[in-house]
A protein has these predicted regions:
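Contiguous, small/hydrophobic- and glycine-enriched helical/loop subdomains that border
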Residues: 40-92
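Short alpha-helix boundary/capping segments
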Residues: 37, 58, 62, 153-157
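Short acidic-glycine loop/turn motifs at beta-strand connectors
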Residues: 39, 92-93, 105, 119
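A short beta-strand motif that forms the metal-chelation/ATP-contact edge
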Residues: 89-101
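Short gly/pro-enriched beta-turn/loop segments at secondary-structure junctions
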Residues: 84, 94, 108-110
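Short, conserved charged micro-motifs
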Residues: 12-13, 54-59, 123-125, 157-160
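Long, positively charged amphipathic alpha-helical accessory segments at protein N-termini or as interdomain linkers
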Residues: 67-80, 102-206
């Protein structure tokens, strides 16, 4: 479970249920709502670009601009999708994914999206809270009904969806393959241990 930078763990997550299911809870640096992310059940991507790319745009306009290529790929897969301001990718059946963004001091914009490929409704209902109340106590059906996973909509394997997204981005913007260097990986691990994996960061009061 990934909560937004300005959210409270107590309000968003039922920690006993998270521990029972083995769900790790982390806090990201971007805003937005809690995201239930499981390996194999989501498709995520991040864009890190010079802030000049979105200069002069409102936040709402920049969200739509940075994810326009995704909508094109999903439409090519036969989905009727659109951008629901501020940050949702939506279809006729419900929400597919959501975006979050942060402008960083180094003159860059970090923009990332999580899309639902499949969803474990029972686990979601036990772990996620809304307004401090466990979702299952309010009725998980209404929330799951608003989520329309890519697996149900496309009938495609997750890797096929990912390959189509990579191809679509490359066709529009170009791609150069690269790898994370050992220094970059080491620095990332330092940031995790020094900040992002600490109880102080997770349970901070925004």
């Amino acid at each position: 479970m990934i909560i937004g930078s300005f959210q409270s763990v107590r309000n968003e997550v039922d920690m006993p249920s998270a521990e029972r299911y083995g769900v790790e809870v982390v806090r990201r640096i971007t805003g937005g709502g809690a995201m239930f992310v499981e390996p194999g059940n989501t498709v995520t991507y991040s864009l890190y670009a010079p802030s000049s790319l979105v200069a002069g745009m409102s936040f709402a306009a920049s969200y739509a601009f940075l994810d326009d290529w995704v909508l094109q790929v999903l439409r090519e897969l036969g989905l009727n999708v659109w951008y629901q301001p501020l940050n949702d990718i939506t279809s006729d059946g419900g929400k597919i994914g959501g975006a979050a963004q942060k402008r960083v001091a180094a003159g860059a914009v970090l923009h990332h999206v999580t899309m639902s490929y499949d969803v474990d409704a029972e686990k979601l209902g036990q772990v996620l809270r809304v307004g401090g109340v466990k979702l299952s106590d309010k009725g998980v059906g209404s929330v799951v009904k608003r989520v329309d996973p890519l697996r149900r909509q496309t009938g495609l394997e997750r890797q096929v969806v990912i390959d189509r997204l990579v191809g679509g981005f490359g066709a529009r913007h170009g791609l150069v393959e690269d790898r994370i260097t050992e220094d970059e990986r080491r620095r990332a691990e330092e940031l995790i241990s020094e900040k992002f994996a600490t109880e102080e960061w997770l349970h901070r009061v925004p």
